[in-house]
Regions:
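FMN-binding flavodoxin-like domain, especially the glycine-rich phosphate-binding loop
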Residues: 1-2, 6-13, 20-32, 37, ...
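Cysteine-centered iron-sulfur cluster-binding motifs in ferredoxin-type domains/subunits
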Residues: 181-183
């Protein structure tokens, strides 16, 4: 099962690639989150969660929905996070989420896609966006291969900067810049 949350299409694109390559069903979390639908989602043992990066972690509304929703059959979870430049130390928080859900954490992959957080950054022009998406293909392919083979994603780098951005900066950045009023 491939679950995805997408606001601008980057995560949806990656999730669709994963679902097609792995012959897995695809479920958008957007409508379920919007309607507060936390009814159980039947899955096989492999659960792939594709989300954008909000302030160097998965979006809080996605985290909360995942915590409230049961996934009968799921035993392992892989996280794939799309971002404009980096996901910080998000894997640590995804591991904690897996522990809370009694799932084996299979790691977090970072897929750099066109920047779309236009409140603070310039979105790339069309040609640059196409170049970024083309450059992301090998990372998407590696993620597909890992899930297909049941392998964990390689551990990301573990720098003080990443821990700082996903840790103390996250709540400040979230309070000042992240809005989810559409949900």
């Amino acid at each position: 099962m491939i679950l995805y949350f997408s606001g601008t299409g980057n995560s949806k694109y990656v999730a669709q690639r994963m679902a097609e390559a792995l012959n897995q069903s695809l479920l958008s979390m957007n409508d379920r989150i919007r309607s507060h639908d936390t009814s159980p989602v039947e899955t096989d043992e492999r659960l792939v969660i594709v989300t954008p990066t909000y302030a160097w972690r998965i979006p809080r509304l996605v985290r909360d929905w995942l915590l409230e929703t049961e996934f009968p059959g799921a035993a392992q979870a892989w996280f794939i996070m799309t971002c404009g430049s980096e996901i910080g130390h998000a894997g640590r928080y995804n591991r904690s989420l897996c522990q809370a859900k009694d799932l084996t954490d299979m790691g977090t992959a970072q897929i750099i896609m066109p920047e779309n957080y236009i409140a603070m950054f310039d979105a790339p022009q069309a040609e640059e966006a196409r170049r970024i998406v083309a450059k992301a293909q090998p990372d998407i392919d590696r993620s597909i291969a890992a899930v297909r083979e049941g392998r964990p994603f390689p551990p990301p780098h573990d720098r003080l900067y990443d821990r700082f951005m996903s840790g103390p900066v996250n709540p400040i950045f979230y309070a000042c810049f992240v809005k989810s009023s559409a949900f």
